[in-house]
Curated annotation (Swiss-Prot):
UniProt organism field: Arabidopsis thaliana (Mouse-ear cress)
Pathway: Purine metabolism; XMP biosynthesis via de novo pathway; XMP from IMP: step 1/1
A Pfam family reported for this protein in Swiss-Prot or TrEMBL: IMPDH
Listed GO MF terms: IMP dehydrogenase activity; metal ion binding; nucleotide binding
Protein name as annotated: Inosine-5'-monophosphate dehydrogenase 1
InterPro entries: Aldolase_TIM, CBS_dom_sf, IMP_DH, IMP_DH/GMP_Rdtase_CS, IMP_DH_GMPRt
Length: 503
């Protein structure tokens, strides 16, 4: 052994019987002979779904719906639409995501007809509140709108009325433009119509609403790379399904609207139910990639690989809103889980999604270098403009709800299937409901994050994911476990106060 060797190879570090998280380990720097711009983050979600960046949005009902899926695809990643809703609703979300050629999530509020506007907070930073049947943009018809100036002129008695009683109608075709309109033409139409917003329609259904302010905001975002586009020329979108008999009907509807990959969504994927569903999907839809999980051991992974999965999802109890390890006493530290599962998956060429535990760009670097092909993000993307739900204000902070799919609130709505639950029996929570701060748009957040990831790869001497995996397997990349003091030293410390900005 050379006296110049530092640290440990990964196989030795992860064989010591400890369950490591991302913060527990640190990579040692290697040799740099290329620029940051030379780093390629291109990868695969599954066997036949290529991505330009290794980013996947989690199938959670407070993270991934149409705007998130379209935005992730436009950046070169992909979104996985949750299934905590009816079959028709999930299919509608996928259809809308594929129709969002311009993935612009408006800053304007969207309310249901019976809503009462009690303060200007309902408008957020926008001049509009739009009225839609369910209070979201996932159903096909916009009913009307209210402007901030209009509401300010109303007296107190009028403000107690339902929004439907005083909104302005959007029925006029003057507001509508085709969904496939070019961005430059869209900007011109907004200026020409002098109405402040336009409604994008496809086959008579509302796809999106875009305001002048939205256009100006998006123009200030970093330019994105090649998007994730499918053979049909539209954004590639993934979807989560369960393993029950009813999910076979759900899958049929999703295939009909063009879903590009399906994730079998289970907190413990090594089950007879998932093995049977994998075989059903591969037999019925052989051209559709199916991703199995969640798993954290090589044994679990091997079972799903032998059943025919095209990708694996790794993580159990590592998410910020997940309490599985606490409640059920099962799981694994995410760094250890990713390394172990990737070791067996690499032998079969199966891409691995590292799901959970991602709080910063450093965690993404660690997950990818340890063998993952992509990272799945929940809390990292929750609170963004594209995440479902409206903003609220708490102690002067702009926040959005974020809940675990194992929380009682989500399980009551239907996600108990993910935890192999039965709606007629007791429900045991494996997650919590919380809130996260406003993060702005993922169209800005992700490009800056990916640049930070590239810098991490450069420091490690890896110009691509494939290069990083090769350096790790050949024991050239070295790691060390971090003591508690080392973790403190590696963060901001010794200051009375500070302001931390990522970009």
């Amino acid at each position: 052994m050379s006296t110049l060797e530092d640290g440990f190879p990964a196989d030795k570090l992860f064989a010591q019987g400890y369950s490591y998280t991302y913060d527990d380990v640190i990579f040692l720097p290697h040799f740099i002979d290329f620029s940051t711009d030379a780093v390629s983050l291109s990868t695969r979600l599954s066997r036949r779904v290529p991505l330009s960046i290794p980013c996947v949005s989690s199938p959670m009902d407070t993270v991934s719906e149409s705007h998130m899926a379209a935005a992730m695809a436009s950046l070169g990643g992909i979104g996985i639409v949750h299934y905590n809703c009816g079959i028709a609703a999930q299919a509608s979300i996928i259809r809308q995501a594929k129709s969002l050629k311009h993935p612009i999530a408006s800053d304007a509020g969207v309310k249901f007809p019976e809503y009462e506007i009690t303060s200007l907070d309902a408008f957020g930073p926008s001049s509009f509140v739009f009225v839609e049947q369910t209070g979201t943009m996932t159903t096909p018809k916009l009913l009307g709108y209210v402007t901030k100036s209009q509401w300010k002129r109303m007296n107190y008695e009028q403000r107690e009325m339902k929004i439907y009683d005083y909104m302005k109608s959007c029925d006029s075709s003057d507001y509508c433009v085709p969904w496939e309109i070019d961005f430059e033409k869209l900007e011109f139409v907004l200026e020409d119509k002098q109405k402040g917003f336009v409604v994008l329609e496809r086959d008579g259904e509302t796809v999106n609403v875009v305001t002048k302010d939205d256009i100006q905001r998006v123009k200030g975002y970093p330019k994105s790379g090649p998007g994730t586009v499918g053979p049909d020329g539209e954004w590639m979108v993934g979807a989560a399904i369960g393993t029950r008999e009813s999910d076979k009907e759900r899958l049929e509807h999703l295939v009909n609207v063009g879903v590009n990959a399906v994730v079998l969504d289970s907190s413990q994927g090594n089950s007879i139910y998932q093995l049977e569903m994998i075989k059903y999907v591969k037999k019925t839809y052989p051209e559709l990639d199916v991703i199995g999980g969640n798993v954290v051991t090589m044994y679990q992974a091997q079972n799903l690989i032998q059943a025919g999965v095209d990708g694996l999802r790794v993580g159990m109890g590592s998410g910020s809103i997940c309490t599985t390890q606490e409640v059920c006493a099962v799981g694994r530290g995410q760094a250890t889980a990713v390394y172990k599962v990737c070791s067996i998956a690499a032998q079969s060429g199966i891409p691995v999604i590292a799901d959970g535990g991602i709080s910063n760009s450093g965690h993404i670097v660690k997950a990818l270098v340890l063998g993952a092909s992509t990272v799945m993000m929940g809390s990292f993307l929750a609170g963004s403009t594209e995440a479902p739900g409206g903003y609220e204000y708490t102690n002067g902070k702009r926040i959005k709800k974020y809940r675990g799919m194992g929380s009682l609130e989500a399980m009551t709505k239907g996600s108990d299937q993910r935890y192999l639950g039965d709606q007629t029996k007791l429900k045991i929570a494996q997650g919590v409901v919380g809130a996260v701060a406003d993060k702005g748009s993922v169209l800005k957040l992700i490009p800056y994050t990916m640049h930070a990831v590239k810098q991490g790869f450069q420091d490690l001497g890896a110009s691509s994911l494939q290069s990083a995996h090769g350096l790790l397997r050949s024991n050239i990349l070295r790691l060390e476990a971090r003591t508690g003091a080392a973790q403190v030293e590696g963060g901001v410390h010794g200051l009375v106060s500070y302001e931390k900005k990522s970009f």
